[in-house]
Amino acid sequence: MGFTVNHIDSTLAPYAEKSYQHYLADAKEYGITDAERYAQDKTLKEIKQGVQSYTYELAQTQNALGQTPFTTISFGLDTSKWGREITRAILEDRMSPDNRDVFPKLVFMYRGEINGDPESPNYDLYKLSLECSSKKLYPDYLSFSADDIKGEHYRRDVYERSGQTIAPMGCRAHLSPFINPETGKDVTDGRFNIGAISLNPVKFALESKDINGDFDQEKFDALVEKYSNMVFDILNWRYERVGNLYGSSNPLFWCEGGAWQRIKTTQQVKESNLLDGATASIGYTGLYEMVNAMKGDNWQNVSDDERHQLQAEFLSHVNRIREERSKADKHPYALYSTPAESLVFTWEKLLTKQYGVISGVTDRDYLTNSFHQPVWIHSSAIDKIDYEKEFHQLAKGGHISYAEFNYGVAPTSLEAIVNYAMRQGMYFGVNVINSVCDDCGQHGDFLMTCDHCGSENILVVERVCGYLTYSKRSGVQAVNDGKWSEIKERVRHGVKRGQLGSASYAESH
């Protein structure tokens, strides 16, 4: 998880207008010819420099472990003059060949009549965004349209009801809809998540065998109940713990406008409604391996439909427990698809140590992330979207899907795929390998050595989970062994329905 500045275009646009009026007044005072053009040029320059300074300051801010703050900005729906120019400046800054930033994460908010349709006012910015994604991976795309979802879709429904946008916190965490009881209005900004704990359904499946080694569904369901309730007991304690904090523990957040409601430094959080708008999340990972563990030696014969059904049944079961505990504890719990940057490696090693190497379960260096189609499966991007779209609706507290493409994939191809994902109401990202050679300056799709000069002194930007990171710095691996194995096994997805993807990096090099 991380920190998000939602609708940054709309947030900053009024200040750009103030700058414009300031420069316009100066131009008129000093008799500058074409005062409007002067004021506009100065304001555009200020916007550009502001974006550059903002990203630079974030990159230079690090904790004792050398970590950069996990930050996200969302934009794309503001059709005002300055809102559009702020969006344009963000995209053009990230597209610069010299820009190697991975933070802030960029999220383009999609709504057909605003930026997705060719005749929409911000369509040019959507096209620019796709061009940026084709080489720099970001922005990701967040749907506020969901045209193919006929039932409830909470982001779209909140937006259509109130005009408010729900943006992800960090890479994928989402807050549930919340209405301020005092005003009756939706609250989407100034809210927060107080923690996430993950389940290990692969272990549950391995533990759910009878004396003959056959899978026992009742035992599995009992383990899901037991450990889910254990998680909610801990999260309930977490709410109590946060509720006992005083405003003075973090005055910038609790007292000075960071949160959606303010308290005094001498007040406890529980004396307000602040926690009514907070969530705590139950996560999970490894659904692909969970099904394989259920099926034992027959796992290779499981159809996609059966696998999909078993994964959906698990999530539905956890959701039922979540709803019961939310009602009993009076807290807004959420089901969250854990990013598991290191957990997929750690859990695989622990499972292997306890159960040995099991075909389809512990025979790789990692578990498959959350509900995702495994990275080594050859399919089209559209087919992958179809496989994963239901899980976005089941795990509303955190989700993202992405597809793999070649560096510099044609924006027109991306547009068709992103449009399809947006019609399904998804949160969707574009994956390419974005590498830079520190010796010759070559940009491209290479993971081990520069494809121009052969140097190993390369910087590789990859999506490790929802965030981008440097998987290699100066030619040295910078992620855990499990994630590195997964990155090398990723296949490129076809751009048309039914079109199989190209070979993985390991197969093609």
Predicted regions: what is each one?
Residues G283-G286, G397, G466, G482:
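Glycine-centered flexibility sites
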Residues T279-A293, S316, R463:
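Contiguous, well-ordered alpha-helical segments that form the cores/surfaces of helical PPI scaffolds
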Residues M1-D276, D297, D304-H308, A312-V460, ...:
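Conserved catalytic cores of very large enzyme subunits
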Residues M1-V5, Y284, Q311, L335, ...:
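Short intrinsically disordered, low-complexity coil segments enriched in acidic
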Residues K45-T55, N292-A293, N480-I487:
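Metallocofactor- and cofactor-centric catalytic cores in central/energy metabolism, strongly enriched
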Residues M448-E507:
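Long insertion/accessory domains within large nucleic-acid-processing enzymes
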